[in-house]
């Protein structure tokens, strides 16, 4: 049986493209398919990537909920409806590939109840730079002589941000000659590889 993937994005979708390519011509061919792409930003280029690949897309933006219900209640309703949308799609796995919203218990508990796993890609090593601006913070730490390596990981999503159990971890050296742009490029290259590997590993483990 081919595993169905729902991919959550917020931006350019380069990691989404890596998954699509792997399902068409790589290690995921014949074992997984991206069946839906959901974005929280209408201008996310990843929506175009999905459309070009013939993958259905949808938009789920937070602002209308905040306007109607206020920030706190609006966010809870937004998250609850996000969970409903995902559950209706009945995916084998949900993949956060550059999704820039923290997933609250309002999302995670319904998914867990429906036995839908969710994984996230984070551009840092486990426990090193949780949260936002991880690459920038790692670069700054290297400039101060505190670290010589950073990395990327794919992990199971839990309520604590970027603290779920790692599935695959890849170290990335930080050279003294690296610019922030060079480091970003190295980390993104590692991300594209390990995200596909993690999906393959999960599917294999569940067979």
Swiss-Prot record:
Reactions it catalyzes: N(1)-(5-phospho-beta-D-ribosyl)glycinamide + (6R)-10-formyltetrahydrofolate = N(2)-formyl-N(1)-(5-phospho-beta-D-ribosyl)glycinamide + (6S)-5,6,7,8-tetrahydrofolate + H(+)
The keyword Transferase is annotated on this UniProt entry: yes
Superkingdom of origin: Eukaryota
Enzyme Commission designation: 2.1.2.2
Recorded metabolic or biological pathway in which this protein acts: Purine metabolism; IMP biosynthesis via de novo pathway; N(2)-formyl-N(1)-(5-phospho-D-ribosyl)glycinamide from N(1)-(5-phospho-D-ribosyl)glycinamide (10-formyl THF route): step 1/1
Residues annotated as binding (6R)-10-formyltetrahydrofolate: 100-103, 120, 162
Feature type site, description Raises pKa of active site His: 162
Keyword field contains Transferase: yes
GO cellular component: cytoplasm; nucleus
Active site, renumbered: 122 (proton donor)
Alphabetized GO MF terms: phosphoribosylglycinamide formyltransferase activity
Alphabetical UniProt keywords: Purine biosynthesis, Transferase
SUPFAM superfamilies listed in its UniProt record: Formyltransferase
GO terms of biological process kind: 'de novo' IMP biosynthetic process; adenine biosynthetic process
Residues that, per the record, bind N(1)-(5-phospho-beta-D-ribosyl)glycinamide: 13-15, 191
Xref: InterPro entries: Formyl_transf_N, Formyl_transf_N_sf, GART, GART_AS
NCBIfam families: PurN (TIGR00639)
Family designation: Belongs to the GART family.
Entry protein name: Phosphoribosylglycinamide formyltransferase
Annotated source species: Schizosaccharomyces pombe (strain 972 / ATCC 24843)
